[in-house]
């Protein structure tokens, strides 16, 4: 291990030597200090003081530091620190040893001369030893370990020079199945061909339990909705019969004006091309492109003269004519630019006052895409603090989805073992059923290719002639880079700013031709100077380029099949010789149709142990691989299973690939091999390196970040294409729903994050934000809801007849639920109306110490009424005690109350929860009256002092507050959570009367806010 301190120490010693050589004549040797008792005492005191200060600093910094457990990295740092401290200690010891007593003596002539001679001799000996040992290092004699050998081989494979050399070497093909180039071509074709992958998946997985699943059907519908082609087809079908009877865009004058504006916009665009981003093209500088460019230059003069002769007699129309202005106004109203402006105004975004150039718009969009602050603001506004009510985001739903995936994999493997392997079947390509399936898939794929050719290639203006793939690619790239952007610039730069364009003049045509030739030349020049010369990599992931690549592949496959059919008709059938069988096997392995089947099926030789092992591994990881291929389009990282499989395949097959390459048998160059070779030459090293970077777990280095930023800033076509595709249609609710569903479908990311976070606690501060998050999580959690749902599932409910007791319980439940969940208290509205109801209501009551005992006017009436009420109350207590002792506890409360109310009409029953009458509460029957007209009871009170006189009763209950409550009226009391309420007396179903022990206040309080304390 290299310790950087050694170099520092060496530098320090060298500096000391240089300083000593410079100051040898000026040195003064001091006398050593004699160590006596005072020096020893001072040394010990210094050590004690330093120890005390160290402990004080340790105590002060104790609260500022966080102690963590010893991780491997921390132990490594400790060991390095120990080595560094030991090296420094040895360095100081050597420096002290060099200052010996002999050296402190005065320098004499002999000592100085001896020192110089010794130094010269040491330098000469050092140089001789260095020259003798030059070229003999320890590394040259060491054996090369396997790790170093493997690292060197990986480095060679990753280098660009070695890669190109290996590409040339692998152009000789053999009949082996596991060659790296064949596997890479197969993998890339599968990744690019999404439609073929889905078709192959549908052919292989024919189980109704897999195909008919709701999530699969939902994913298919989501892909159809998100497809722009399907959206345009649906729009055309719906709007076919809704066109306007008069379309000003189809008039001759408007078309002429539009053509002139297009040509003028081309001139304007080419004129300002130096002020904007330099255009970038990923087309290679091929010989036939140069030939085409030179030919176009030679023909441009002739074409220019021909068009000049044809346009001699044409006249120019007036741009300010009434008809032209009318068409221009209609075009502005119908244009997409107007809709976008109205959409931006409706969104509330202010329009900038200065002119927005295309370069400024591209820079602004790039800043928005790269800005992390915008994402955080959207997160704060839209997500943070809002409770999620979607069922798809609950932990239970994610867990169920994860278990479903596991069960599906298990079921798939189980069916494979039971139906195929368990019945002794061999997956051989020569079985009649497999041959028939192959033939059917070939016919279906051929039909699909023709359909794609008609709809994608011919329907979009491309010519499916005998041109090569490079020519088609160049044509498509030219269309993308010119027509689409020029038309958009026409709408935004010229028409939107009220500019008037002249007609199709001679100068405009000449400028158009010259700009086209200059643009092609400028693109190639910028490509060589700006991109290739600076080591930048051209991105192949542009949607337009991907679509062009897809088109070229479809056409190449169709052309290949046509050539194969022509070749079949030119040959006669002969007996298969070993050479022909070997060539057939090679063609089957290279064929694109064979890639859609399982790798290894249809071999004409006996399977070796290595091939059987590869087959079993592919069968075991097939279900995971298919799912992971879908996830290549998502923004999530590779799961651990896929990473492990990739690493295993790389580690296992490195040596095997080389051996198979050496065992390759050269064959003649067939048309299939020629086509494969051309396709491999077109696949650049950028694609492979990009895939390697996506597979590594390191962050992007500064050079890669700079290259990415430069690519984004330089590529003007890319930004314009992205902006155009992002604003061609408005965001419909279906599109938003599809986006949300696609984000919610993938549960692998959430489960992986959950597994990684499991068992890794971290100490964080208990901030108010964290408390808020905890409370929100507790409220959002539906675990309790699902638990209760599972308990009551299938039990059903028994309908009962509504009686007064059930009605009262239902209303109480409604009050409690409103108060607990919604924060709505229905009794507040009734309390606001209570003072008006209580006015002028008088109820006769008396108690010891009541004011009524001193009133001479009402004494007789009060005495008679209270005497009758007291007799009824005593009789009621005796009757209830006898009925309670003779009956069981299960008697309904509604029946008891009905009987009591029939016998004693003047009594009013209280809540069954408190039962104050059986405990002898001092509430007389006439003290309160209950009204059931509105479902809530009203308390008619006449004297507060008479209520306070009842606090001395020894049998009153004590309650504790469960929530905070603020008094809404004068006769109510306020309390907090945890307060004790004494002398509680029930009034009706929803209200009680009591005294708060903490404040000493007495008044009414809600019954659902307190709980009984034994």
Curated annotation (Swiss-Prot):
The keyword Repeat applies. Residues 836-953 are annotated as: Linker. Abundantly expressed in cardiac muscle, but not in skeletal or smooth muscle. Localized to Z-lines in cardiac cells and to dense bodies in nonmuscle cells. Isoform 2 is expressed in non-muscle cells such as in fibroblasts. GO terms for biological process: cardiac muscle thin filament assembly. GO terms for cellular component: extracellular exosome; I band; stress fiber; Z disc. Keywords: Actin-binding, Cytoplasm, Methylation, Repeat, SH3 domain. Coiled coil: none annotated. Residues 9-24 have a biased composition (Acidic residues). GO terms for molecular function: actin filament binding; cytoskeletal protein binding; filamin binding; structural constituent of muscle; tropomyosin binding. It comes from the Eukaryota. Residues 954-1014 form the SH3 domain. The modification Omega-N-methylarginine is found at residue 795. CDD domains: SH3_Nebulette_C. Nebulin repeats lie at residues 29-63, 64-99, 100-136, 137-172, 173-205, 206-241, 242-278, 279-313, 314-348, 349-385, 386-422, 423-459, 460-496, 497-533, 534-569, 570-599, 600-635, 636-666, 667-693, 694-728, 729-759, 760-794, 795-830. Residues 1-24 are annotated as: Disordered. It holds the Pfam family Nebulin. SUPFAM superfamilies: SH3-domain. Binds to actin and plays an important role in the assembly of the Z-disk. May functionally link sarcomeric actin to the desmin intermediate filaments in the heart muscle sarcomeres. Interacts (via nebulin repeats 1-5) with DESM (via rod region). Interacts (via SH3 domain) with XIRP2. This is Nebulette. The lineage of its organism: Eukaryota, Metazoa, Chordata, Craniata, Vertebrata.
